[in-house]
Amino acid sequence: MEDNLRSSLLASMGEYEALGIYNEVKKNNDFIGFTRQYMHDEDYRVARNALWSMTKATDSEISQLQPIYNELIDLAMKTDNSSVCRLTLNILERLKMEKDDLRSDFLDFCLEKMTAIDGYPGIQSLAMKLAYRMCKFYPELMNELIVTLKAMEMDFYPPAVKSVRNRILKSLCH
């Protein structure tokens, strides 16, 4: 079974195939085992496709990945593959975040990624959302985030990043 699944993850995938993998994982109710097994695969296609399949999960299903929250953070920060990073950040953004979950290395990573002018819009936007969620717990960090957001030269960023930034600033001003 695992060899067939890995072969499927190695292949070029579309939405239909990603949903098929997700449904297989759902049937086995093994979201953590599947994610752990394939998120670090040496072939980035396997990791990317596995993570993409997990983005199809419902919020209650995704919440089953909460125990590997820190492993997902480590993956997002260490991967050289932008798709793996973006998909991992997408999953992290859907997980619960508590005050005690703050990792300064991850906050620094998110601040760096959200302001990187040459970055990918999906990564920038997700990093900005995650930085906001982390900073909400600490007024001094929130002030720093506001200064950083206001200092961003928005002429250099795509519409998706501008939109997330504006929504965050609007929510803080009301």
Model-derived segments and spans:
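Alpha-helical scaffold domains
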Residues: M1-H174
